[in-house]
Amino acid sequence: GNIQVSEKKYLQILKEILTYNPAYIDVEFFTHGPSFAALKDFRDKMVLSYHNFDEVPTDLTNRLIKMHEEGTAFVKVAVMPERECDVLDLLQITRDMTLEYGDHFISMAMGDLGRLSRISGYLTGSCWTFASLENSSAPGQISLKETEYILDILEK
């Protein structure tokens, strides 16, 4: 998500990861387009992602459609809400995309406001959630223990 490296270094890192034959590899689409283009043969293992640590952009639906059209295994978006309605908008956009294009979308709103989005996949169709083992790797991330507890209650 939030890493500042040259395009050459980014591609080098991704190629190194692929030598370990991971189930999936996360590739930033809008900030590292050339790396995505160089790895198109690995679409079936690719989580095509978009991170925005500042806002929920008004063109998010269009971005998701563009990413979906690339034909990767999953499309992931992580955005920073400024208001409660930003979280609700993300939940609705995720649901709309899932109903229209299938169940390969992953979405989350970051920060304290976004915590609901991390556990509401059963409502929106977001097919993954992310939890921390010890230290949070993203703003608003919930621990694995808390995530399991909450999801267990919600799935009863």
Where are these predicted regions, by residue range?
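An active-site metal/cofactor-coordinating segment within enzyme catalytic domains
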Residues: G1-E7
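C-terminal alpha-helical cap/extension of soluble enzyme domains
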Residues: D86, Q92-K156
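Catalytic beta/alpha-barrel core
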Residues: L14, L18-G33, V47-V56, A73-E84
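Glycine-enriched alpha-helix->loop->beta-strand junction motifs that scaffold or abut catalytic
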Residues: T19-A23, A38-L48, H68-F74, T98-G102, ...
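Anionic-ligand binding region
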Residues: L60-M67
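Extracellular lectin-like interaction modules
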Residues: E7-L11, L64
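Active-site-adjacent beta->alpha loops and helix N-cap segments on the catalytic face
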Residues: V5, E28-R43, P57-D59, E82-M97, ...
